Amino acid sequence: MTRFLAILFALLPCIHSLSYGEELRYATWNIRWEDPKDVEKGDDWEKRKGPIANVIHAHNFDIVGLQEGSPYRLKQLMELLPEYEIILSDTMEFNPIVMRKGMFTVADFGRFYLSKTPEKKSKSWDSKHARYCTWAKLKFKQNSLFIFNVHFDYHGKDAQAESAKLMNRKIFSMAGNAPFIFAGDLNFTADSKSYQNLDTHIMKDSRTAADSASVPNGSYNYFNPERASEWTFDHIFVPPYTKVRRYEILNETYRDGEKLRYPSDHSPVAIQIELGGKN
């Protein structure tokens, strides 16, 4: 598979480069695929792309892991985010990594599949689709930061459980002692068997580790601001030694005439962390 780094716009001058001890804002966000039924309900992409970009701008994220993008929709979104660049692991990328220009250089990137044969496009266990992880190794002042952006299968419980085990192995072998962020739409909640399969010697949940948190509702919002949600399928994990300053589920809406709408059927989950390597 040909790998490439897609930079959709000319690079801006480097304004700031991170160092260990500095803080970084990361978000994971499933921006919803294009379901024809969404158009009928008034939640079509043409309405949503502007509010999605507005949320990213308003919260000043340094890195965003997206899920359920598509090539032409990602191109449209990046046109609204000229201060960001995008990492695509393939021409048909749905889980890109978006990062602020000038903060990092990309040392390496790619994808592996959530299957028994992760090196090739494949699905295993009871997975309905061939799911994968988009990853990147970012450099800042001679230091490294690994990003693992995933979207687990929604159908197969065995696939979810085995994908969690695979992520344990991949993060351990690829990141080593370097700081990392493992995040995405995992399609399971914190009380599930799959969640319990994540190795706490390798990672911790930023939600439970945060110094402060804002959790007005679950991350899955049904596209309905009037419906309370208790389901959080979107998670962010970091190494045990990483300081998590803030965790938030962002209950952001936009106005469409007299109606309030969500930009996606998932709310973005965001953290503020202090970068640092293992002592």
Regions found by a protein language model. Name each.
Residues F109, D158, E162, F172-F180, ...:
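Metal-dependent phosphoester-hydrolase catalytic domains
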Residues I15-L80, K165, L275-N279:
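N-terminal, active-site-proximal structural segment of metallo-dependent hydrolase catalytic domains
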Residues M1-E23:
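Bacterial Sec-dependent N-terminal signal peptides
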Residues W29-I31, V150-F152, D185-L186, S267:
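Active-site metal-binding loops of divalent metal-dependent hydrolases
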Residues L24, D62-I63, L145, P179-I181, ...:
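Short, Asp-centered acidic motifs that coordinate Mg2+ and/or phosphate
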Residues I63-S144, F152, E248-L250:
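Structured beta-strand-rich core segments of catalytic domains in phosphoester-bond hydrolases
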Residues T28-G50, G110-S127, D153-G156:
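Acidic/histidine-rich helix-loop elements
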Residues V64-Q67, L88-S89, I181-D185, D205-A209:
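Active-site neighborhood of phospho(di)ester-bond hydrolases with catalytic His/Asp-centered motifs
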